[in-house]
């Protein structure tokens, strides 16, 4: 029987997380622990805190994680990557170089006779008009083309700073409940 794993919101590379390299190593160690099993992995968005692929450039870093994804797919492990609001700008690098299956939309699939609706969750049913406008802007091919014209030295810096600011913002002036050691929501 195939083992199926669901992971999301690692936010690798985040400047708001104190020990980012340690976090990446822990994630890679977990993925390493499942590599010999008949398994499938669903990465449900925001695995990176900011990911933007330029035509010939991808963000610096994430070497251990990208290498482990490549190793898993080379061994026949099915790895599904759903884009989230921090990594919506995936081109074809992850699929061509690492062998992952990219999903830009929600997926309904059957696993062990049960139907699953898989998505990052960003914007699902969110009525906030400002958020919808921002989401539209991030998905606009015209704005992506303009952003691509900015040298990666500045655009990646802008993206990482924006992501850090977004993470540090408080919801209604309070910290949300059920936060883990890296200030991530815990869902049990």
Task: Say what each PLM segment does.
Residues 2, 35-37, 60, 68, ...:
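Context-gated lysine
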Residues 2-3, 7, 12-111:
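Core catalytic region of metal-dependent phosphoesterases/phosphodiesterases
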Residues 6, 115-119, 126:
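Short hydrophobic-aromatic micro-motifs
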Residues 29, 49, 56, 70, ...:
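Charge-rich, low-complexity amphipathic helices
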Residues 110-111, 116, 142:
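Acidic, His- and aromatic-enriched active-site or binding-groove loops in soluble protein domains
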Residues 121-183:
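Active-site-proximal loop/helix segment associated with metal-binding centers of metalloenzymes
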């Amino acid at each position: 029987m195939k083992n199926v794993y669901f992971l999301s919101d690692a936010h690798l590379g985040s400047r708001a997380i104190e020990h980012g390299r340690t976090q990446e190593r822990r994630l890679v160690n977990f993925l390493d622990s499942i590599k010999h099993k008949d398994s499938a992995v669903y990465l449900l968005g925001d695995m990176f805190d900011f990911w933007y692929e330029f035509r010939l450039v991808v963000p610096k870093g994430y070497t251990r994680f990208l290498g482990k994804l490549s190793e898993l797919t080379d061994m026949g492990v099915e790895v599904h990557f759903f884009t989230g609001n921090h990594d919506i700008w995936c081109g074809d690098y992850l699929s061509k170089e690492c062998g992952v299956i990219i999903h830009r939309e929600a997926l309904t699939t059957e696993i062990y006779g049960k139907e699953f609706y898989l998505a990052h969750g960003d914007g699902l049913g969110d009525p906030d008009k400002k958020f919808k406008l921002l989401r539209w802007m991030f998905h606009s091919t015209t704005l992506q083309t303009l952003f691509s014209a900015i040298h990666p030295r500045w655009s990646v810096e802008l993206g990482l700073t924006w992501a850090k600011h977004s993470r540090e913002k408080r919801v209604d002036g309070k910290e949300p409940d059920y936060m883990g050691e890296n200030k991530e929501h815990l869902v049990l």
